[in-house]
Swiss-Prot record:
This is Kappa-casein. Residues 1-21 form the signal peptide. InterPro entries: Casein_kappa. It comes from the Eukaryota. It is found in: Secreted. Mammary gland specific. Secreted in milk. One of its GO terms (biological process) is lactation. Its main location: secreted. Kappa-casein stabilizes micelle formation, preventing casein precipitation in milk. The gene is CSN3. It comes from Oryctolagus cuniculus (Rabbit). Glycans are attached at residues 132, 142, 147, 153, 160. GO terms for cellular component: extracellular space. The record marks 116-117 as: Cleavage.
C-alpha cells in the first residue's frame, strides 16, 4: 500500500511542473502576441493518472507467479505433484511422486497431505500372523471396592463391675510401684 502511495506521489510530482507550465502558456496565448512561439512550442503529453493506475495495477513487473499464502485443495487448480501412469509388470518398482519442473515451487517446507499420499501395500500379507499376547500370566481385572454403609447388629452390653475394678487395681499397682 505504501509503494502505491509513493508511486502516485512521484507521478504527480513529475507531472505538476508540466501542468503548471501549460497553464501559464494558456494565459499567454490569450494575448495572441507571438504566433511563432505557439507553432514551435512542444508540450508534454497529458496522461491522466487513472489511466496509469488502471493500466498497471501492480506498478512493477511481476516475474513470479502470484500464489496464495494458504494453499487450497481446488480440483481445478494445477497441483505441483502428479503421478506417472503405472503399468504393472513383474519386478518393476513403483515410481514415486514427481515434481513438475515448470511450476514455481513454494519456498516453505512441504507438508504431506492425505490427499497427495500414496498408500503402500503391506508386504507381510503372505505370512501367517501370530498373536503376541503373553499366555502365561493372565491379566485379572482389579476388583473395585464398593462403599456401603456398615450397620452393626451387635448390642452393647452394660459394663460389668469387674471391668471397672480391674483398671483401678492396675493403677493402684502402678502407683505403689512408683512410690517404692
Amino acid at each position: 500500500m505504501m509503494k502505491h502511495f509513493l508511486l502516485v506521489v512521484n507521478i504527480l510530482a513529475v507531472t505538476l511542473p508540466f501542468l503548471a507550465a501549460d497553464i501559464q502558456n494558456q494565459e499567454q496565448t490569450t494575448c495572441r502576441e507571438n504566433e511563432e512561439r505557439l507553432f514551435h512550442q512542444v508540450t508534454a503529453p497529458y496522461i491522466p493518472v487513472h489511466y496509469v493506475m488502471n493500466r498497471y495495477p501492480q506498478y512493477e513487473p511481476s516475474y513470479y507467479l502470484r500464489r496464495q499464502a494458504v494453499p487450497t485443495l481446488n480440483p481445478f487448480m494445477l497441483n505441483p505433484y502428479y503421478v506417472k501412469p503405472i503399468v504393472f509388470k513383474p519386478n518393476v518398482q513403483v515410481p514415486h511422486w514427481q515434481i513438475l519442473p515448470n511450476i514455481h515451487q513454494p519456498k516453505v517446507g512441504r507438508h504431506s497431505h492425505p490427499f497427495f499420499m500414496a498408500i503402500l501395500p503391506n508386504k507381510m500379507q503372505d505370512k501367517a500372523v501370530t498373536p503376541t499376547t503373553n499366555t502365561i500370566a493372565a491379566v485379572e481385572p482389579t476388583p473395585i471396592p464398593t462403599t456401603e454403609p456398615v450397620v452393626s447388629t451387635e448390642v452393647i452390653a452394660e459394663a460389668s463391675p469387674e471391668l471397672i475394678i480391674s483398671p483401678e487395681t492396675t493403677t493402684e499397682a502402678t502407683a505403689a510401684s512408683a512410690a517404692a
